[in-house]
Amino acid sequence: MANDHPPRPSRRGFLKAGSAAVAAGASLGATGVAQAALGKTPAHGADPQTAVEPFYGLHQGGIVTPQQSHTYVAALDLTTEKREDVIALLRVWTDAAARLTQGATAGPLPTGAAAKTALADTKIDTQVETKADAKANDTAYSPTNAKAAPDSGDVLGLGPCGLTITFGFGPGLFTKDGKDRYGLASRRPAALVDLPRFNGDQLIAEKTGGDLFIQACANDQQVAFHAVRQLARLAYGTAAMRWGQSGFLSGPRGQTPRNLMGFKDGTNNPSTAKPQLMNEFVWAGATADAPWMEGGTYTVVRRIRITLEHWDNTEVDFQEQVFGRHKYSGAPIGKKNEFDPVNLKEEDKDGNPVIPENSHVRLSNQASNNGAQILRRSYSYNDGTNFYIERWPPWRQETEYDAGLIFVAHQSDPRTGFIPINDKLAKFDMMNQFTTHVGSAVFAVPPGAKPGSYIGAGLFET
């Protein structure tokens, strides 16, 4: 891991490596930040800590963006009854996210001798707080305390780290307890269906659902968490945290990451470099019921605990039969290279399928699912240990790892993507004896925002 994820630079070292994004974000006014966030193409730096991703655009970032090394995903429940409060929150979130992705603070920093002294180590320029900024701080940036800091300050000097922030809307934004909510029930996309209960699900309410979704991805764990932390604070009084989860990648950058089971995860993804595939499988079109979703996507998040203790005591040959791939190369069984095509018709000398009938690769393959594909952008998680009773032999009852996969999948329609694919996996996949789905959510992720507008404007204003 040390070679895969370079150590973060010191605050002074970051300045030498290129602190322009942070300095610009802190010293420019709102217009300057918006212009920086509008970058036509990602400004990938040689150092992952200085990489900058644009915020504004046709699509939201964090979907087809090259995967960063860390994530923090969260869902919030709306507590307000007023439609205008939701719009106000989305405006504030959009402005803050545009700043954060450029390496700036969530709100304009205060000025004065004390502030300058505190920032001396980071060499971040302070923005001159105008009357308009002060009013914004009093209303938007400090919803519960007008004197609260506009930013927690825990990532000052760390750089943008390729941060992307993605927002989504859960079914609860449209209806609650069967009743219209905020006048949006008629605008709920047909594709935003409630996920069915799948075989083997052991969902925990506190890790399931949510009205609003935030996904922050960055090349630094603290930067990803910091982004969600600021946005959650800005939501005080309008929305409350329902669940949150951090995650990480394993593997060299630019290569398919490995999950905690030691296998490469995402090899058969549709290529994000091919627009025709993204338009077919990932980006939503302008349907009659939800024209505002054109250019957006539908995101499924599943928290999947893996019984690592059980898995670690199985033979590699068996593990490869479970996956349908060779563990170390990532190649399909019987092949040599990771990206060799999967041949589901190939048989051994005895007439048995080379790739087992109930292997993960066969059951999830496009050829086994009427041509359906989803874009997986998953992360591993490790939350320490807990006491568990295993649901498969040997049915151990002991303290085990609370670790596994934050499964994240984007698609143009869950009804033809995740739902039928996972229904088959939940019934027949050999991997089920090592995994348990304990969290689940689905969100409509609207298209990107334009400068001066906000995420989801098409839903509320057209």
Spans of features found by a protein language model:
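N-terminal secretory signal peptides
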Residues: 1-9
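Long, histidine/aromatic-enriched segments associated with O2/redox biology
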Residues: 13-33, 38-462
